[in-house]
């Protein structure tokens, strides 16, 4: 295998026994692919598929006017270029979007001619608002903040059959129902009630008998009975005897009420016996086809057809009439020879439709339509037309109703039809088939659906949701356009006069800005970004709500396997409603999640990979990825553990049809980053996956010694690193950019052979953590496409690095690690292991007020020199200034209202022209409890206002940077061009030119003495070479011009003013970098759900140490392991100890300058001789220098990868411990740092990867003396943001009462809270050094009095004089 640039520098030892069949797919594909399908930006408009924007336009257009004389047709659309790039949008608070222009055609028809003759056609491009663009990392920048649109898991359109689980009726009877869910349109429900009648509901309104709907569709009673029932035929003799045409199989299970005999009079079934299969066989053998039945047998049956009097033609009895003795007598009297009844029985053919028809008030189609109209629009008088139109629009109009391709596919599959395509609206057959299937299920044929099955839930991603919103906007436009179209002809309007783009723009903006699924991106670290984009939520518009979601929806379903992670989901009210995609899962064209599988043929595993959705998966027998196989890929076990029909069973190898591709395909990205996941309890693994997302990037990222091999994928796909777009050689590297000269074979004709990567330096993330990129390449090194050139936050040499490897011991230590507390050594603080940088953005806005405009200035009234020392002449703080709470960052003054002046003041004003008192100081100050360094200042000025000195300086610095970049690019292109020219010219004969001799070959020395301009003047003997020289000159000139144009464009953007909100003159943004060291109260965690709060930081000399004098960094409580069942952390510690000790061995060898061969041999022993990994590391392909570099990178430990469900075994860990010279128990004797005595027994010591979580004590704790008070109760406000007090609540009062601490209690409830006079007096007293208090009346008592009075009860306080 080929190693990438970073892999070569540090190889991770992999314990995996199973080969990698398939690379982990690109992790953000679900977002990018979905939005690409929506915009289809790179597809020429004649090749665009019917999806996304294109489909939305096609579904609304053409719009025809009411008169039909004018129509507006859609031709195509084009997306423009974004004005600002992503970084500029974030800085300016703009939305990263492109203008959408739609080409439409207005056609006007001739009114007079009978056939529609076209009178006029106008075509025009119309602006339809802005469409937000997705960045390369799958996010959107909306108003300057990065947002993510989370995919939604919703119920697939189609038809579903279910029952109420016996909850509706007290008897516990199962009531079945069917529901047709369209993609958009009205829901149609059929349901049984406890009396076994069938009802229909439309849009969950009042229920009507189901026969009303069928009648409205145009079916008569007779047709309905014919559709749902078979009939029994009877003959009537003159004497009134009934003869049944016998179908023997129908009798099975009935109890006879009379004897059944054959033709010869032999008894076959006695009276009162149940007819069995044996009886039926006897009847068939005897050839009995007719049976004379008594009248009692007939009573209670229903007629299947209308019975008509042959002579008069009148209807004697309507169909569905129940037969009684009177009816029979009438039939005999009328001379009816034969009639048919409905065949029903108790077992598998109930009389549901027949009974429903009897309860149906409607008799004709019109009555049924009116009944439906009344239910849908109560209170409106129905007319025939309105009732027909309403019903037609409900399910049969493509404008109002759409099942969608998915819905039609699910609908047809569920009803057992062959075709998967069809119309988007319902047909009569569709409705009847749903009802038939429902009745079959009630009759015991067929089963209900499982709505939590992933074959019945589909994923709606960004593109689809954006398309729906866009369509909503277009529908609003359509109404307006229809009305204007009638005027189009008379007033000669153009298409752009007809279309108002505002509704479309508003709908799109609303979706991206404030939809429940458009979320502020979680940007704590690269993993949290990736996880956020791969999240699948069941909440949101058209989804579930937290309160209504029951237990079943939240539970893990067998179909989640390989599609949705069973581990990663939030704790709390959203548990199970928000899920994460499994590592290998993707969505198919219908939006169902599918998972990859290897095909197995005749017990032999092939390399062919097929994706199966949950719908298809159940049919197949699927083996686990870990199933044992030999070299030829044949399954070796006699019985293989397989999944079949969503159950886990055992089958023989020949029956296996598919096999999983990887053991980690079950879990999500975050869970696959937990080493030894298979040894952790699921609840703790859930916490582990969730807490990794909260890890704050540390100052120096450090790769995990014990990882899982997924770290590389996450770092590369997250988009926080700089990845080489094309291979080449590193031309230059500095802190802010990397310049790559692209390899010749990757340069396309006529483009620059240079890639410049500007690094992001110290910028703020959404969570106020620090985003910083550091280059890891050196000048002159070769890189290939896809290599990582610079590490982002929490990335170390191209691997995700969320925390630090700490030396840990499991032991109690004087109660300091009681209940998950963590004891930390001071060394951790000194080495800045968990020091993090947080960046805060503070904004100062100067507005136009009624009294005049605010001004940003250094001239602030009543402020001393000291406070202004950090401001420049514009009143803005210097970059690099260290500021603490209360310091002024931006000086700002606001005009004050004119107050009435005394005559004396007026006189002074008149004499001295004193004007300073009419402004007040509203400067931006550093908030309380914040201390940091100013790292950046941005000034935005409204267009048309003069910029201050500071903005001009910032602008100049930015322009210099751009100019420098462009010059660099030109220099490299120029260098490459002249290199190619030199190669072409040297050794060939010259004709004319400066410094060349005619007829002599050109040499390197000749060229070196010429200036570059003179090179172009050389003429050669060979015309081909002359053309090459000319082409090079033209190409360089063009490049220069292009770069100048680019510079002018950027300059123009910088120099124009900014588009600020109305009334805003200037915005100053100050960025503060705050350094947070670790301290007691901060929350830390491992990757196995083992979290805790730091209780104390102990000096190094007090910490326990081993025989070599190495102190422990962190002491954890051993009682945190057994009850939590996350043993993975213990294994991680053992393997970490082995990794570290091997690193120390390598370090020793390097210090002793051992031969390279010896080091190579030791590395080979580590990588290739311990464990049964499926792949050997090819150390022979490394040069000696590369081996030394690799060894140098392994000095602080050899990184290991132990994958989920395919990790290191105990034996392998012991071998590595032994190789590193450690006891294979992983335990050692420790000594007490304070006394020097050894502890009683050996202690488990090792290295664990610890994370510092974004729950820092600095953000949570504050102290207040005096501050703001609530308006009504006059009690101090609560919360850190309001600088509030500590609540002394009900239970705390009880505690003081229990102690009888009366004075303390009085103080708490009066002067420390809401006794206004008392607290002011107290403040004065303390200032005077007098510590007495005089409690008065608490304000809340007055509030109570007022509330009682508001109830109409007079209450007064009597005071003793």
Swiss-Prot record:
It catalyses: RNA(n) + a ribonucleoside 5'-triphosphate = RNA(n+1) + diphosphate. GO terms for molecular function: DNA binding; DNA-directed RNA polymerase activity; ribonucleoside binding. The keyword Nucleotidyltransferase applies. It holds the Pfam family RNA_pol_Rpb2_6. It is an enzyme of class 2 (transferase). Its EC number is 2.7.7.6. SUPFAM superfamilies: beta and beta-prime subunits of DNA dependent RNA-polymerase. Keywords: DNA-directed RNA polymerase, Nucleotidyltransferase, Transcription, Transferase. GO terms for biological process: DNA-templated transcription. GO terms for cellular component: DNA-directed RNA polymerase complex. The keyword Transcription applies. Belongs to the RNA polymerase beta chain family. The RNAP catalytic core consists of 2 alpha, 1 beta, 1 beta' and 1 omega subunit. When a sigma factor is associated with the core the holoenzyme is formed, which can initiate transcription. DNA-dependent RNA polymerase catalyzes the transcription of DNA into RNA using the four ribonucleoside triphosphates as substrates. This is DNA-directed RNA polymerase subunit beta. The gene is rpoB.
């Amino acid at each position: 295998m080929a190693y990438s640039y970073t892999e070569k520098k540090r190889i991770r030892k992999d314990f995996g026994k199973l080969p990698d069949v398939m690379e982990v797919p690109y992790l953000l594909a679900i977002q990018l692919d979905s939005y690409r399908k929506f915009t289809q930006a790179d597809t020429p408009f004649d090749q665009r598929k019917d999806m996304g924007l294109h489909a939305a336009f096609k579904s609304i257009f053409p719009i025809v006017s009411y008169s039909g004389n004018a129509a507006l047709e859609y031709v195509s659309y084009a997306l423009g270029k974004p004005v600002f790039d992503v970084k500029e949008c974030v800085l300016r608070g703009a939305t990263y979007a492109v203008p959408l222009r739609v080409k439409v055609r207005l056609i006007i028809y001739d009114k007079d001619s009978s056939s529609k003759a076209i009178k006029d056609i106008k075509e025009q491009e119309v602006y339809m608002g802005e469409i937000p663009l997705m960045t390369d990392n799958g996010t959107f920048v909306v108003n300057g903040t990065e947002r993510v649109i989370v995919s939604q898991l919703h119920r697939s359109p189609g038809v579903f059959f279910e029952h109420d689980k016996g909850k509706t009726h007290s008897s516990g009877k199962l009531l079945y129902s069917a529901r047709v869910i369209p993609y958009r349109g009205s829901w149609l429900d059929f349901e049984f009630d406890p009396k076994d009648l069938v009802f229909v509901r439309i849009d969950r309104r009042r229920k009507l008998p189901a026969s009303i709907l069928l009648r409205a569709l145009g079916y008569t009673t007779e047709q309905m009975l014919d559709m749902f029932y078979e009939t029994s035929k009877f003959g009537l003799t003159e004497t009134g005897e009934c003869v049944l045409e016998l179908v023997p199989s129908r009798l099975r299970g009935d109890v006879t009420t009379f004897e059944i005999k054959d033709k010869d009079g032999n008894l076959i079934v006695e009276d009162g016996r149940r007819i069995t299969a044996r009886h039926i066989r006897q009847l068939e053998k005897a050839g009995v086809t007719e049976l004379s039945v008594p009248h009692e047998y007939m009573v209670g049956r229903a007629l299947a057809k209308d019975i008509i009097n042959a002579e008069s033609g009148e209807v004697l009895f309507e169909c569905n009439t129940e037969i009684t003795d009177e009816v029979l007598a009438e039939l005999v009297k009328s001379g009816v020879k034969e009639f048919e009844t409905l065949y029903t029985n108790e077992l598998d053919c109930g009389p549901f439709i027949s009974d429903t028809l009897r309860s149906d008030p409607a008799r004709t189609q019109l009555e049924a339509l009116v009944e439906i109209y009344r239910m849908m629009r109560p209170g409106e008088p129905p007319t025939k037309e309105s009732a027909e139109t309403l019903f037609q629009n409900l399910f049969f109009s493509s404008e109002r109703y759409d099942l969608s391709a998915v819905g039609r596919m699910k609908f047809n599959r569920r009803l057992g039809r062959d075709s998967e395509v069809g119309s988007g609206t319902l047909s009569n057959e569709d409705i009847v088939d749903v009802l038939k299937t429902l009745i079959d299920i009630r009759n015991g044929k067929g089963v209900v659906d499982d709505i939590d099955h992933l074959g019945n839930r589909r994923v709606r991603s960004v593109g689809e949701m954006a398309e729906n919103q866009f369509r909503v906007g277009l529908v609003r436009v359509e109404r307006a356009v229809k009305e204007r179209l009638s005027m189009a002809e008379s007033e000669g309007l153009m298409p752009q006069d007809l279309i108002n783009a505002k509704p479309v723009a508003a709908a799109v903006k609303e979706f991206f800005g404030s939809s429940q699924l458009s979320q502020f991106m979680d940007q704590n670290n690269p993993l949290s970004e990736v996880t956020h984009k791969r999240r699948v939520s069941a909440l949101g518009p058209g989804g579930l709500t937290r309160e209504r979601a029951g237990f079943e929806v939240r539970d893990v379903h067998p179909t989640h396997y390989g599609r949705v992670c069973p581990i990663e989901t939030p704790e709390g009210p959203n548990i199970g409603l928000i899920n994460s995609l499994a590592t290998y899962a993707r969505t198919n064209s219908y939006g169902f999640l599918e998972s990859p599988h290897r095909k197995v043929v005749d017990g032999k595993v092939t390399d062919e990979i097929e994706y199966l959705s949950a719908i298809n998966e159940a049919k197949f027998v699927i083996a686990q990825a870990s199933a044992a196989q030999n070299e030829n890929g044949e399954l070796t076990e006699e019985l293989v553990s397989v999944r079949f029909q969503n159950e886990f069973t055992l089958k023989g190898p020949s029956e296996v049809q598919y096999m999983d591709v990887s053991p980690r395909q079950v879990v999500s990205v975050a869970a696959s980053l937990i080493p030894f996941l298979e040894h952790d309890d699921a609840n703790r693994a859930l916490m582990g996956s969730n807490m990794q997302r909260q890890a704050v990037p540390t100052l120096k990222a450090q790769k995990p010694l014990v990882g899982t091999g997924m770290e590389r994928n996450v770092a590369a796909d997250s988009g926080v690193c700089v990845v080489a777009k094309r291979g080449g050689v590193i031309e230059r590297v500095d802190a802010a950019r990397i310049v790559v000269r692209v390899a010749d074979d990757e340069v396309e004709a006529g483009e620059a052979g240079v890639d410049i990567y500007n690094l992001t330096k110290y910028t703020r993330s959404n969570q106020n953590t620090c985003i910083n990129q550091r280059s890891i390449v050196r000048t002159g090194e070769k890189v290939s496409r896809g290599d990582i050139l610079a590490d982002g936050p929490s990335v170390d040499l191209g691997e995700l690095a969320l925390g630090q490897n700490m030396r840990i011991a499991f032991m109690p230590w004087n109660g300091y690690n009681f209940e998950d507390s963590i004891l930390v050594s001071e060394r951790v603080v000194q080495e800045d292991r968990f020091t993090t940088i947080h960046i805060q953005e503070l904004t100062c806005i100067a507005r136009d007020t009624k009294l005049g405009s605010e001004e940003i200035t250094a001239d602030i009234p009543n402020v001393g020199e000291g406070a202004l020392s950090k401001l420049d002449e514009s009143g803005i703080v210097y970059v690099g200034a260290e500021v603490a709470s209360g310091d002024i960052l931006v000086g700002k003054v606001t005009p004050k209202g004119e107050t009435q002046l005394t005559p004396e003041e007026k006189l002074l004003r008149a004499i001295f022209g004193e004007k300073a008192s009419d402004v007040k100081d509203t400067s931006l100050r550093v908030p309380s409890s914040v201390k940091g360094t100013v790292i950046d200042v941005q000034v935005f000025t409204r267009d048309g206002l003069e910029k201050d000195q500071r903005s001009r300086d910032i602008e100049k610095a930015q322009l210099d940077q751009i100019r420098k970049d462009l010059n660099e690019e030109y220099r490299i292109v120029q260098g490459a061009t002249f290199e190619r020219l030199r190669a072409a010219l040297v050794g060939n004969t010259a004709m004319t030119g400066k410094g060349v001799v005619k007829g002599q070959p050109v040499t390197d020395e000749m060229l070196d003495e010429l200036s570059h301009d003179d090179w172009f003047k050389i003429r050669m003997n060979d015309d081909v070479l002359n053309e090459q020289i000319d082409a090079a000159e033209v190409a360089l000139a063009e490049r220069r011009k292009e770069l100048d144009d680019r510079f002018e464009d950027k300059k123009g953007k910088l120099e124009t003013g900014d588009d600020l909100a109305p009334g805003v003159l200037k915005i100053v943004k100050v960025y503060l970098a705050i350094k947070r060291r670790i301290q007691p109260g901060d929350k830390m965690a491992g990757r196995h759900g083992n979290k805790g709060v730091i209780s104390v930081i102990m000096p190094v000399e007090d910490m326990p140490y081993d025989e070599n004098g190495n102190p422990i960094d962190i002491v954890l409580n051993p009682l945190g392991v057994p009850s939590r069942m996350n043993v993975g952390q213990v294994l991680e510690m053992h393997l970490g100890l082995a990794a570290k000790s091997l690193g120390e061995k390598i370090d020793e060898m390097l210090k002793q300058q051992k031969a390279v061969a010896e080091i190579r041999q030791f590395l080979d022993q580590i990588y290739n001789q311990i464990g049964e990994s499926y792949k050997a590391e090819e150390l022979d392909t490394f040069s000696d220098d590369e081996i030394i570099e690799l060894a140098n990178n392994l000095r602080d430990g050899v990184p290991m990868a132990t994958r989920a469900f395919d990790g290191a075994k105990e034996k392998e860990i012991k071998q590595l411990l032994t190789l590193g010279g450690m006891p294979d128990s992983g335990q050692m004797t420790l000594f007490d740092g304070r006394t020097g005595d050894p502890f009683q027994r050996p202690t488990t010591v090792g290295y664990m990867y610890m994370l510092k979580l974004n729950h820092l004590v600095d953000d949570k704790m504050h102290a207040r003396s005096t501050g703001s008070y609530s308006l009504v109760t006059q009690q101090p406000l609560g919360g850190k943001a309001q600088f509030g007090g500590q609540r002394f609540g009900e239970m705390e009062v009880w505690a003081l009462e229990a102690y009888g601490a009366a004075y303390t209690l009085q103080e708490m409830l009066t002067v420390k809270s809401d006794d206004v006079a008392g607290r002011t007096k107290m403040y004065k007293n303390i200032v005077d050094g007098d510590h007495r208090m005089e409690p008065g009346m608490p304000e809340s008592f007055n509030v109570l009095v007022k509330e009682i009075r508001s109830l109409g009860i007079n209450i007064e306080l009597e005071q003793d004089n």
